[in-house]
């Protein structure tokens, strides 16, 4: 800023100071100074008249401040002045009444122009020119102008020459009067507290006292402070312009008061008998007037009386200090009491409009009810009370809807007579009684059983929660009178009675003893009751043959049951009968003994055996036990004999002692039980003498020898009969074993027999033929002639020879004769080592001592010899070659015969005698053949020589591999014709040693498993049968490339899924993954071989996807493996409740659409609570602000009303349809500010409209208390459909709709915010009947949701 700028500033400051001084000298009553400031921007200020203009060369437009100073004189002196003249007005115009002085200063650097205009009145009135003050002011202004002019001249001579100014300039103080000007520096040296080039900028005083901010030297104070230096406290709202602020406190003007002077002061400060409220007195009771100085009656006697010296004289029917209370009735008395009603009477004034009778049980939780009667009544009967309860009864008088104080009484109803007495079960000694429970509280029950004859009886007392009782210890068949009485304190209800007769008892302790095969003895204990007869029934278990029944007289306690079937299971039952009543039967089972076999007999006998036979038992015996021993009983023997087919069974006892008597016992055996034995004695035959032989004979005698009989005998009896027929006998002592018969006929043939005898018992005979005199061997017999042997037999000589000599030799070769010495007892001989096809001469002589008989001569020709050294060669599956050596004897040809050893025909072929081998063809493979060979000459055939041979096995055929997979292949082949025991399969791959597999011979296929994927295999195979092995067949195959395994979709969201798998065993190049959706979209991806998972992104929501994956190796691809998943976790496509929405992933509470029973045609919008106790709740009622009217008619409650996002009722029809889907649970949430409780019921259902939407709830849990169970099973009621059991219409009385009873303990559809008794939203066990709950939500959820959501059933946490 140049010197001109400083001058301008100084000038402005001087002018301002002088004007302030001028204002201070003028008194308020004389003159007034008005200052107006105008701010404008302009490019130039033109000079007009005597005004000067300053042309700025700044690039920016200057800022112009116009200051107008109006100096006014008092109105009383008729001084006037023109105000706020514009600096742009034409200053040359004549104005005789106004003297103006205009000055203008400009600052080049800041481009700020100050214009000052001072208006002084001149001719308005005589005071304008004569005022001494004004003259002094004008003089000071002129002096200031001169000082400014002088200062400018001084600056123009040195450093301030660049500054130029035009116009009317006056004196401006040096450095704004706040410093000294230095010509050396051509600048100001400011005093303390000032700064700037001309010292015009002040520092803020005291730094604003740290209570404000300094801006351009001025303090901008904090809100609590004021003053130049912010050191003064500010008064509240600046005392509302109605007082002075002194040290931050207001000193208020009249008639104001208060810390900010905003309140009006009350007259006389309400005389100390009231409170001041904004200038108005609120008087205390008993005082009135503007300043509460006047006494008055309370509430002006409420208009129901007149005031007299501050006291109210009330009209009839009213009372109280202000006559506001209605006088209560008097002399309340009880005229009658029953179990359900109380009759009351009272006295009251005639002015009463009506009476209100309030009654409530004294027990905790009792519901308070009311009844209204006209004012001219003096009594009432309260109905539908609960029996056995004590009631607090209050009677109010009502005049003009005002209730009096009550007159009260405490009255107890009588106990009700128990109802529904019935007998549940009746036995001989017990009776179970059942009756209906009471719905009210009482102490207990008393039940008595009194016999009809009044002899004795039983009395029992039971708890009140018991409604059934089982009385034991009664007499059977007795009639009892049963009484049930309710007890409470000292009171007893009238009894309910019924008669009952116990069942007659039957016989007990039934016992069956002395059971045989056909008889059983039954015993029992007789019944205690008097009966007409005893009924005994018995029959086979299972009902076969029906039952046999006997009627027995009561004294009997035993009976013999006969004609039973042996070995059978019987059931016997015994009961008692009186009139038409039959007791419960006592029964038991028993099994008859097995009957012994009958008619035991001996069929035939020998010396060592007995043939036994007997008739079978009637019982179904499986076998018979035969026990036998000699009568001496030295040793017993047992034999089990199966039951024979037919009526009898036979067995043979062997290895017995001859001639011995045996004791035999036979028992029938059935199911490890046996009958008593049937016994008999039987004797074996005597043992016969054996080996009876003739040792010598003469013309008249025959000597005999025999083997001694083994059993005990008395003697032997020898009978000998000649051919003439006259027999003779002789007795021989038992110790003899030889005897000679004498005096026989010479030359006669005798038949000799010998027997052993013991008493009258005789053994079988042994017989021999003998001759007296000499009988030579007559001829030789030849048999079994072969090529090298012959069998020779002959007859006995007589007398017997000492030895025999047999000679034989080929005919014409007597020199080769051979001799054979034979024992005299021999009757045959076999000659061996003979030559084939040779005639032999055979002679036999008997030697008797020294005498040799004439030889007996015979001849025999041996047969031709067979071929020798048979061998088999060149064996194939259907042919072989037979070789042999030629026989010695001449022959015509060979006969070769062959056939399978098992089954098959015999085939023969003739081979010339010159051939020694033969090829047999057309044989069966792997078959054992018997091959025989003999030589034939004429009709004579040699012996056959045989051998066995197996043909070779034929190979299985057409071996192929089918059904090839990565790890399996099915081998199939055609079986060979021959029998196969096993197949041998050898499986090889690459250079690995083969794996040998043995397969059963009946199979024609085999499943190869556990193969390596993508591997080339070679299979060789042959068949075996015993030692035989077929030829080998082979095939090749390659397993397929195995697919990836265990393809799984996890981490499925609404738009992505993680696909993972296990790699295949084979080496691969990559994977080909394809996924497609149900809408037809399809995408294929190539995945690296080392990857085992991929995340699919950008999927569609709520869409079913199929993922296909296969491995690839060059051009080969594996089979597909697949999996499916559904995005969005949509478990239920059409959720039928909020729980299913929650399981679908919908976790935000709000409005959702459900589909009843999952059907698209039955959709319903509901509000879902997804957070409370696990979420999934359907909210069907909400009360929260009272914006929705719940006092509605039946039709509204059926269909529902309100806003699901605010207050609403879902509708009874909808609630019924939802709960009909399954079992639901109920939760009621209630809040009062920060206090929250809930009630939970594990079952909830609302029936249909035909049942009037009855409510059904289950067991309670929670923190609110159980108030809803009182309404269990109640139909719904509205103002136009009264379905409760109360005298009044509960819905109408309590302005709601609910499942009322008589009337309610919860009224969640009541009037919002209404705290009158029972009128609001009540839950009795939480807030009682006189509090309206601000927030209520009723909600339901499927009971099974806790399980299906994967959570264990847990106890509710409070």
From Swiss-Prot:
Listed Pfam families: EGF_TEN, EGF_Teneurin, Fibrinogen_C, fn3
Record localization: Secreted, Extracellular space, Extracellular matrix
Gene3D superfamilies in UniProt: Gamma Fibrinogen, chain A, domain 1 (3.90.215.10), Immunoglobulins (2.60.40.10), Laminin (2.10.25.10)
Record's signal peptide: 1-31
Phosphoserine, modified sites: 724
Domain of life: Eukaryota
Every EGF-like domain range: 188-199, 219-230, 250-261, 281-292, 312-323
Positions of disulphide bridges: 297-307, 314-323
Signal is among the record's keywords: yes
Fibrinogen C-terminal domain: residues covered: 1129-1344
Residues annotated as glycosylated: 55, 176, 180, 198, 271, 278, 302, 392, 470, 581, 791, 869, 874, 1036, 1046, 1261
Coiled coil location: 127-157
UniProtKB keywords: Cell adhesion, Coiled coil, Disulfide bond, EGF-like domain, Extracellular matrix, Glycoprotein, Phosphoprotein, Proteoglycan, Repeat, Secreted, Sialic acid, Signal
One biological process term in Gene Ontology: negative regulation of axon extension
GO cellular component terms given for this protein: cell surface; extracellular matrix; extracellular region; glutamatergic synapse; membrane raft; perineuronal net; Schaffer collateral - CA1 synapse; tenascin complex
Tissues of expression: Brain-specific.
One annotated GO molecular function: sphingolipid binding
CDD domains listed in its UniProt record: FN3, FReD
More details: Knockout mice display alterations of the extracellular matrix, and decreased axonal conduction velocities in the CNS.
Job of this protein: Neural extracellular matrix (ECM) protein involved in interactions with different cells and matrix components. Theses interactions can influence cellular behavior by either evoking a stable adhesion and differentiation, or repulsion and inhibition of neurite growth. Binding to cell surface gangliosides inhibits RGD-dependent integrin-mediated cell adhesion and results in an inhibition of PTK2/FAK1 (FAK) phosphorylation and cell detachment. Binding to membrane surface sulfatides results in a oligodendrocyte adhesion and differentiation.
Subunit structure, as described in the record: Interacts with BCAN and ACAN in a calcium-dependent manner. Interacts with SCN2B, PTPRZ1, and CSPG3. Forms oligomers. Isoforms 1 and 2 form respectively trimeric (tribrachion) and dimeric kink-armed rodlike structures, which are linked by disulfide bridges. Interacts with CNTN1, TNC and FN1.
Family: Belongs to the tenascin family.
Domain notes: The EGF-like domains mediate interaction with CNTN1. The fibronectin type-III domains 3-5 mediate interaction with BCAN. The fibronectin type-III domains 1-2 and 7-9 mediate interaction with SCN2B.
Record-given protein name: Tenascin-R
Organism encoding this protein: Mus musculus
